[in-house]
UniProtKB/Swiss-Prot annotation:
One of its GO terms (molecular function) is RNA polymerase II cis-regulatory region sequence-specific DNA binding. This is Mediator of RNA polymerase II transcription subunit 8. GO terms for cellular component: core mediator complex; mediator complex. GO terms for biological process: regulation of transcription by RNA polymerase II. The lineage of its organism: Eukaryota, Fungi, Dikarya, Ascomycota, Pezizomycotina.
Amino acid sequence: MTTLSPDHLKTLEQSRQRLIQLTHSLGSLITSLNQSDPLPTWSSLQTQASIISNNLQSISTHLSENHELLRSISALPAPEFPTKTHANTLEQLLRTKLDPRVEDWVSRGRKADNSAIQGSSGSTGMFSTLPSASAAGMNAGVVGAGAGGRLSEDDLAALWEWAPVEANSEARRRNWGGNFTLEEKERGIQQVVAELGLKRVLEDDDESEEEDEEMDVGFGGRIDGAPDNAGAAAGEHALPLVPINEILRYMTTGVMPAVR
C-alpha cells in the first residue's frame, strides 16, 4: 500500500482517539488510587471500571472491523521526521514484535477466547469453564444449553447443585472484611504493599483480631486490664439466679417468680 485514502486516514485517526481515551481513563483510575486518602468509594471505582470496560470494548470492535487495513499498513518515517528527538517514539512504531509483557497478555487473551468459543459451541457443555473436579462430574450428565441459549431444567438443576458448594469453598479461602486477602498474606504483606505502591500504612488483620479478642467479654469474663477485684465486687451485689422453670412460667402466665 503506497498511499492512504481519506477513509483510511479517518480509520487511523479513530484508532488514535480511542487509544487516547483509554489511556486517560486508566491514568485517572491510577491517580485516584494513589492520591485519594481514604481510597475512593466503591461506586466511584465501579464507575471508572465501567468507563474503562466501554473503552476496551470500543477499541476491540474498531480493530476487528478494520483488521485487514491495519495489518496491511506499515509505519515508515518520512524524511522530515525528527528521528533524533523522537527516537523512542520511532522505535515503538517500528517494532516488529510485541513487548514481552504485552505478548503474554495477548496469549492469555487468545486462550480465553478459544475456551469461550469451545464452550459456546456445545462440545463440552455449559460448564466447561468450571473447576476440573466439578466440571467433570457435571458435564457427564449435562447436555448443555439448548437452542437460543436458554438453560434446560437439567442444566439449572446441575447449576444449583454446583453453585452453593463452589461458593462456600471460595468464601472459605477469602478473608472477608480485612485489608488483605489470604493469598496476599501468604505472599507477605510488605511485598504486596510494594507491588501496589501503597502510601498509607494499613493495619495487619492479625493485629486487629488480637485487639478484638482482648476486648471480648463473655459470661463470667472480664475486660483485659480490669482490676482483679472487679469480679468479686460484682459478685457481692449480684442477684440470685432464677430457676428456668420459673422463667418459663413467667413467660407463659405472667406470674412473677417467687422472691428467694
